[in-house]
């Protein structure tokens, strides 16, 4: 019995235990190797905001370049220097240096410590102003505007840079941004035989890294709620794996139910009102759904095989999970209400297998867009991060390494973060990759790091 429970936990943690036609837009789904040339001069600074303007401009440039979809023009090449938020730029000067888009902005700092930015995005080739969809602060309605503006406390100045970068990214790609968000992960330190694992959090670009726990107990697989203020994770506190909630507002931790056996592999439902998880009892692992308000649970699977690593679809109607009911770890999909569904094979069942390739599949996670499921695959001695359609079609492997594990989606469903060990004995590091399999980047952390999870865009 203990052996089957340990296998269930290993399946769950995977290998870690071993616009207008004339306007320019970026298509980020076709895998183009040519990034959009964009000029972002330092924003003009009001009194006392000179350093803030420089820093905010730098973060905006770094955010956009980090996606691999933009190339910033070297400021040394700029011809026009007398830019103003209220004046049309000399487009010919920017065409000469091959810029397709131009961002002009201003930063001010008032006596109450509030930072404000105002910016415009210009289509250099089309010779016109990009219109932005913004939320009117008076009516709370979305309206079209010739530019964007944000206000925030000085201590949170990086957020105003990320928000501005998100607005630029959204206007030029057509997709939601990802920069004004956070990543929670497991910070690892110490020798392999006595590893200290702490819950940690940072901005999407690696800034403002903070440890949330002290590392007295082993912690795995943190996951964000849709409110971005709660994290669920598995901890070995008390000597057995159990699912916990961590409140980011007050730092309070609590056990999610006093279940017999072990609970692990937690993940929030899309509406944030429930947590789906695995429970191992009497040698068997099945899936359960807990209502966070009533703390009532409902059993989702009842099968002698190991069912683990559940993840709900964007609309909450379905669950994907890993099961060895077919003889090896594979990915399955079921309806959340337990009703039968039509499988890719044409028959009906309560759970349909959607992976049939060589190797073992684990850690499936549904895209927030609803169209893809990311997974870890082990085949021929290598590990891969991949994606597959929810109907089992179009499997694509995006990465390959000695160990790649734990995929997690960006808020817009266009980027996947995961952790990698490049060789035996190497500590885990966080990486991200886009859906084209390009733009593989290491996310810098102060320690070794594993089990990343991306928050929604911050409120």
Cite the ranges covered by each PLM segment.
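Residue-level detector of Asp-centered blade-edge/turn motifs that repeat once per structural unit
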Residues: 177-179, 226-227, 270-271, 314-315, ...
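A flexible loop/linker signature enriched in serine peptidases of the S9 family
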Residues: 176, 188-198, 214-217, 234-243, ...
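Amphipathic beta-strand/beta-sheet edge segments enriched in Tyr/Trp
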Residues: 24, 85-167
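Hydrophobic beta-strand positions that form the internal "hydrophobic ladder"
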Residues: 183, 231-232, 272-275, 316-320, ...
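Short loop/turn segments that connect beta-strands within beta-propeller blades
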Residues: 203-207, 247-251, 291-295, 335-339, ...
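Blade-level signature of beta-propeller repeat domains, shared across WD40, Kelch, NHL, RCC1
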Residues: 428-459
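Short beta-strand->alpha-helix linker/helix-N-cap micro-motif
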Residues: 27-90, 103-109
